[in-house]
Amino acid sequence: MLLGTLQITGEEVRDAEVKAICDSLDDNSIRILSLRGCRVQDEDFKKLMESLKECESLIQLNLNLGVCNGKHRIKWLSEALIVNKCLNSLFLHGTSLGDEGLECLMPSFQVHPKLCSLDLGDCQLGDDGIKQICTLLPSTDGRDGLFELTLSANQNVSPKGWTELAIAIAAKSQLHCLYLDYNNIGDYGAGVFSVALAASSTLEKVDFEGCGIGERGGEMFFTVVANYQTKLDELVLFENNISAELIGQISDCLSHKSQECEERDTDKSHREDNDKAL
C-alpha cells in the first residue's frame, strides 16, 4: 500500500480535517504529517495525539511554528510519544518550549526506540535544556542515538551549554548532521566544537551560519579539516566574521577529502568484487 503525505501550512485545521487525519493515523495509512504553523483547537490537538499513540505508519511529524505551544499540549505530545514506537523525525521548530517544556518531553524521547531526527530550533532553550539533549546523543539499550539534531536560534544558551554539547559529541555521539545556526557561539564556542569535530567519527554536516565566529574561530576549523581524518564533508560558515579566503580554503579542503574518500570507497568495492570473482 502506498502511504500518504499530508502537509498543511498556516491554516486553521477544522473538525472535518482533524477527523480525516485521525482516521489516517488509525488506519496506518499516513507516512508524513506536517501541520506547520497551523491553528488547531485544544480538543482537536488532543484527538490527534490520541491517534498518534497507536499509529504504526507515521515516520515524520512536523509541528513547527507554535502548533504545540502550551504546557497541556506538550504533555499530550509526551504521552503520545511514550506509546508510539514508529516515529523517527519530530519537528518542533519555533515552539515556546523552554527548558521546562523540554523536561516534560524528555522521558518520551529517552524511551522512544526509533526517534533519530529532532528539530528544537528557536525553542527558547537554555543550558539546562542542552544538558538534557546531551543524554539523547549516545545509543542505549533499545534506542539509537540521534542521527540529526537542529538547535538553531536558541540564543539563551551560554558558552557553558555549548561546551557540554561539544563534550557529548566528542564522547559517544551518533550524530551525522548538526544545525547550530544563529546562536551565540563565537570564537570560544568554535574552539570547543573544533575539538568535537576532530573527535567525531560520524559527523558529516555542521551548520554554524550567523554564529558570531571570527577569523580565529575559522582558523581552528581549518586546523581540523586540514589535519584530522573525519567524515565531515560540509561546514556552513556564512554570515560570520570569517574572511572569504579562509572559508574558501576550508571548503576546498573538505572537497579534496571528500574526493579522496570516494576514491578509497571505489577501490575497496573493486577489491571486494575481485575477491568474490576469485
Language model segments and positions:
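Leucine-rich tandem repeat or coiled-coil scaffolds
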Residues: 1-278
